[in-house]
């Protein structure tokens, strides 16, 4: 099974896989889901998936939740799909592990 993130220590970047549920009651990251033998973090977002509103809210939410700059968060795959790959730039591996471990239950 593929894990939901990959970290590149030379560039201090991480790729994370998310399963996004737009139009939710609250913004929330909750545990994992496995699809086609790939792990995804489950992410609920209040915004509707129209005109990039949900994608924008994803970036805003992750930046606030993880105390990162919005400019260091980029959706690189899945702009119009619920399965998204998100690039996190300028992140320390220890800090990334701290974030990830907070969602492992």
From Swiss-Prot:
Belongs to the UPF0235 family. Signal peptide: none annotated. GO terms for cellular component: cytoplasm. This is UPF0235 protein A1G_07140. InterPro entries: DUF167, YggU-like_sf. Coiled coil: none annotated. PANTHER family: UPF0235 PROTEIN C15ORF40. It comes from Rickettsia rickettsii (strain Sheila Smith).
């Amino acid at each position: 099974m593929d894990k939901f993130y990959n970290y590149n220590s030379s560039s201090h970047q991480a790729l994370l896989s998310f399963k996004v549920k737009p139009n939710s009651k609250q913004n929330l990251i909750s545990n994992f889901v496995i699809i086609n033998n790939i792990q995804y973090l489950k992410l609920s977002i209040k915004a509707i998936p129209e005109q990039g509103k949900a994608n924008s809210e994803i970036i805003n939410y992750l930046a606030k939740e993880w105390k990162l700059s919005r400019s260091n968060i980029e959706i690189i795959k899945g702009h119009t799909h619920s399965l998204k790959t998100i690039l996190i730039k300028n992140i320390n591996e220890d800090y990334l592990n701290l974030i990830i471990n907070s969602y492992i239950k």
